[in-house]
Amino acid sequence: MKTLPKKSTRYKVRSTKTYLSLFSIFFSLFSFSQEAQKDTTKVTQLKEVIVSSVRAKDKNPITYTNVAAAEIAPRNLGQDIPILLNYLPSVVTTTDAGNGVGYTYMRVRGSDGSRINVTLNGVPFNDSESQGTFFVNLPDFASSLETVQLQRGVGTSTNGAGAFGASLNMQTKSFQEKAYAEVSNSVGSFNTRKHTLAFGTGLHNNFEMNARISNIASDGFIDRASSNMFGYFFNANYIAEKSQVKFLAFGGKEKTYQAWYGIEDVDKLENDRTFNPAGMYTDEFGNTQFYDNETDNYWQNHFQLHWSEKWSEKWISNAALHYTIGKGYFEQYKEDEDLTDYNLPDFNGNSISDLVRKRWLDNDFFGATFSLNYKTAKTDLLFGGAANRYLGLHYGEVVW
């Protein structure tokens, strides 16, 4: 079979999509208690206010589970967040590579990830096009979490009605009063390893910073389902008596061999459970080969700015700006492709050829959220909203 020459001119096909989310308003019902409660608000409690608008409480008619960092830590050996939470009620998880590293997914009460609203400090994390959640873009993010709340069924979320499946609200670590530094390393099956370095300056003159860098790699259980991921987290805080301002930057870069196709052949399923059809092709001698670079490559960075203010014993406000930028591609070896489908000319009079292509994503997501909380001994009133915009660019590139 003839193929395109290795030095063939690159050709790109682009399409642009723009999404503008509707402005959403959420308004909580009045809640009443039989007796007045003492005001226990302290300066350090402002760190919890940031996510109060999306967190369920004891008196809310919502089924939920709270998970603290101390509960996650013993399990945090390199696997993604869905796998770390698979012991929770009604949670079922899957993993492409077979060992919980790389692409992982979560279902709650049968609802898939597109029906689970995920927020990071109250900021939407779901992909704006598919509504899916790709934790592979945040390697070792569990090391930077302070608390996680999983709400099963209809819940509270800044993302609105899409939360009918479940809501996963994650809060990152807040400021640490004392300076610290830590190094963490773990190794496991299938050549899996995780290396983490973290430090914090401690609180000095109302300022504090903490950061983390991580590397996770694995060969995977499935054939060639390797992963190599880098993640980072940075948090800067200003703490005053009635105010808190925090800036966060976090994200990651991943390269994972594609393993999302599954097995349709019953014989393969019974006798070769690790078989991976990704990248498979037949060479000129009729032998089955696998393309070495059938990989997914993507990086994503998140930036958040939060401001919390306690105006009085009854009024507290929260506001946040956020921006997420991501770009990447997955590479594929394709056999017997029609060159006209790519707007490419015939090669030596032949319109059918093998080729290697990259399918690119280039995304920007930004917006703002706010909430205003009025609370007395018998009343807890919350008003807030969010406005977001998403810009997505898709295009293809023939590289061989």
Which residues fall in each region the model found?
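Hydrophobic, lipid-facing positions within transmembrane beta-strands of outer-membrane proteins
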Residues: 47, 104, 164-166, 179-181, ...
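Transmembrane beta-barrel wall of Gram-negative outer-membrane proteins
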Residues: 187-217, 222-259, 298, 303-312
